Structure formats: structure tokens, C-alpha cells
Amino acid sequence: MTNRFKEFLWKLKLLLKEPLLFLLILALLFFLTLFVIFPFVKMLYYSLTTEDGKLTVSTLVSAFTNKSYRTTFFNSMKLGVITAIIGTIIGYMYAYAITRTNMRWKPFFKTMATLPIISPPFVLSLSIIFLFGRKGLITNGLFGITNFDVYGMKSLIVIQVMSFFPIAYLTLSGILESIDTSVEDAALNLGASRLKIFTTITLPLSIPGIVSAMLLVFIQSLQDFSNPAVIGGDFATLGVESYRIITGLYDLKRGTLLSIMLLMPSLIAFLLQRYWVRGKSFITVTGKPTQNRGKIAEKHIVYPLFALCLFFCAVILLFYGTVLCGAFVKVWGVDNSITLNHFRYIFSIGIRPLKNAVTLAIIATPIAGILGMIIAFLTVRKDFIGKKYMSLASLLTFALPGTVIGIGYILAFNAKPFLLTGTAVILIAVFVFRNIPVGIEGGMSALAQIDPSIEEASTSLGANSFQTFKDITLPLIKGAFFSGLVYSFVRSMTAVSAVIFLISARWNVVTTRIFSLFEVSQYSDAAAYIVVMIIVIMAAVFILDRAVNSLGKNRQKAKRGKR
């Protein structure tokens, strides 16, 4: 009997001691296989088969040798690289200003930086049209220019940089805060200038975080569907072209091949970010407290960084303020009289897509949040058969573009025994399994900071794994739980690229309705939908915050009442 087989039997024996845990793991493995791996494999198989069912790579080779497809591929790569470089530079300066200087208004700057992340899609695209389109407030209203073409790559770069630089900021602010400042303080005491310290100490220590942030922004740029679809014009990108070929030409095979072309760089970037960059760290950890670190106070450093943060916050406010104004005018640039007709339309004829989106998000959010924490708990605290497979399957959807997921679901669930297309179930499944990776990552990070002896004490007193997780672990990781819930709700409300292939007449959602309004140039109706979505999302975040903060408090009060 080999050691590996003995280990297998030992793990199986441990699992069988807790039948409910064993059944839970089996159920999770089944659903991850069904809703993540199966659609992914189905799409790969479909793209690599001929009409008579024979496996071949010639279809994929022909896609890469097609001049039009190749141009579209390099357009997406070029947009992703430029956005990643500019967005990471801005994100780094923004993070450095907030974490390393004593400038004012930091809470305001932090709040503004998170706004593009939790906002509906199309906001920045719509604001660019309102400001710089043919009837734009700036182009036509201020300068009288009527032939300015706002569509194309340049506008896309601006929009994507403003949309995704907050991702780089959040990543890099954590990196900068974790760097021990004692080395920098020592260099300063020895007479080194701030510039010398930055270029020889701070920047080199930040390199792993910079590369990680750049890859994350690159992935987001590649996977972005809404902005290229609205403002791309003749600048073709893979995700949008895939959608147009499938819905316009009814050619699922060609659309799938384009999605495979999009998948490859996205998956490579994800693997690099997760397994290569994360393994490289140059951060110094001395064990000394760093909370009272000295902040940079030199005016020639603080003032330019303050101006930079203020500029980008002003641009964000301008964009969002423009959309808000656009929701209250009849026809932007033509008839700017104030009206509430767009909101009357939403809450009468156009209410169903909004109700559907909220309903589906309310159902999917707690499922995704709880599943994320359970999978994180199992991955960190338990040792069982299929653990690595569960980890890979649960995190894979983060690397998959929405168009890839949508096409995979069409192919996987369009026939018996898993006929789900056109139902609410398929949309809920997309929302749940597309959004759990962030909750899992947050839960794993939180669990890594908790001493396992706390849970071991609960187990030794007779509690099973479920009781320990519910009463001990979950209240301790409620911060990660809250983040997972918020992310899931926001992404469920704002999803476009995956659900646009899966909606039906009964189950249309607000984002696809907004997209259809863009196609017929009903921009003020779209703006009104966006304003309502922002209000709904903010209200949901507030409610989730209250609900998660009460986690564990009611139980403690009940225990005190029994004494």
C-alpha cells in the first residue's frame, strides 16, 4: 500500500466522521463542476470540433490567421496594455499620496476612488457622450464644434483608465502600507533625499505590487464589454465582435472562436498574477510596530500629489454629475428643459428589467457570500480529497471574460438534461459562480490571520464543523463576508457581458435594457436608469453593512440574557 493511498484513506476516514461535512463537500464539488468546469470545457470542445464532430485545431488556427480577427485581437491587446500602464501609474501616485503623505481630504479621496468600482456600467461612456459628443456640453455647447467624433480608441483609453485605476490604487495602497518604513527612516536620517529614498527603496519594494496591479487592470480592460460596445466605434475589440457575430450573424462557432482568442491572454495574465507575482515579495517585515510612521510633509511633494488627487476626483464628479443632469433633461443638447418623464417611464413601462435585476441580485448575493466563506473555510482549515480542484474551480471564473462565460452557459445549458436557458436559474448561477472568487480570496486572507486554536477549542468542546463555522469563524471574518456580499450584489446588478447572451423576454435585466437604449440613442432614459441603479446599490451597501455588523451581536445578547 503506497503512502499516497494511505493518505487518501486517512482523509476519507476523517470526512466520514462528519457525514454532513462530507455531503457538503460533495455538493460543492458537483455544483462547481456543473456551473464552472462543464461550461468551460463545453466551449473549448465546441471550438475545437468540426461540423461532423471531429476534433481539430484547424478552426482555432484559422481564427488566428484571419486578418480581421488578428486586427481585433491586437486592438484588444493594445487597449489593455495602454490602460494597464496608465491606470497603474495613476493608481500608484494616488496610493502613495494617501498612504505616505499628510495631505488633507484623505477620506474624500478614498471614497471618490471607490465610486467607479461600485457604479453601474456605461456611466463614463454616457458622460463622455454628454460632454464631448455631437451635442456635447463642451464640444457643441462651449466651443460650437458639431463634427467632433467622440468614438474610438482615445475615448476608450480615457474611460477605461478612469474606470480601472481605482483597482490599481486599492492593490497598491495595501502594498505601500505593508512596507516597513524603518529602512526609509534610516536613509532619511543619513541625509538621503526623498527622491533618492523613493527611487532606491520604496519603488523597488513596490515592484511586485505594481506588476500585480498592472496585470489586474489589464485583465479588467480585456474583459470590459460595455465601454467598447458603447464608445468603441470602428475600434473593434474581441468581446464586442464576438457578441455582434453571435447576435447579428447568428454564427455561434465564429463567436466562440473570438472568445477563445480573448480567453488566452486573460487566463495567462491571471495565472501570472496569482502564481508568479504573488510568489515574489521584497517587502521587509521587522516585527516592529509601524502605525506611528512619519508622513511626508514637504510642500513640494504634498501639493502636487494633492493636486493630482483633486484633479481625478473632479473628473469623476464631473462625469457622474453630468449623467445625473442628463437624467432630468428631455433631450440632451437639443431640448434641455427639466423633466421627470424619464423616471416616470422607468417606474411604469420600464420597471420590469429593474425589478428582475434587484430580485436576482437579492437571491444570488447571500448564496455567493455564504458559499465564498464556506469554500474559504474548507480550503484553509480542512484537508480533504479534491481540495485543490475545489480551489481552482471556484477561482477560475475570475480569469474568464464575461463573454466566455455567457457562451459557455449557452452551449452547456441549452439542451436536456440541463435545459436552463431563458430561466432565472441560469442568471442566478452566473451571478453566484462569477462573483464568489472575491469572497473566497477575502475569506482566505481573513482566516490566515486567525489562530486555528480558537476553532480547535470549539471542536474539543464537542461542536461540529458547522457549529464552529457558524458561531466562531463567521463572526470573526465578517469584514471579508461583508466585502464578498457587496461585491456580489454590485456585480450582479451591473453584469453585462455574461448575461447579455442569457436573457429572455421574461428575464431581461436593467443593464441589457440600458444597452438597448444606447443602441437607439435614448441617452436620457439610460441616464435615469443609471441614477436609479446607483441609489439601489448604495442602499443595498448600507443595509448589508448593518446586517453584517449585527452578526454575532444578537447571539451575545441572548447569552447575556440567560445569565
Regions inferred by a protein language model and the residue ranges of each:
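Juxtamembrane inter-helical linkers in multi-pass membrane proteins
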Residues: D52, D185, S193, K280-I296, ...
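The alpha-helix within a helix-turn-helix
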Residues: A187-L188, S458
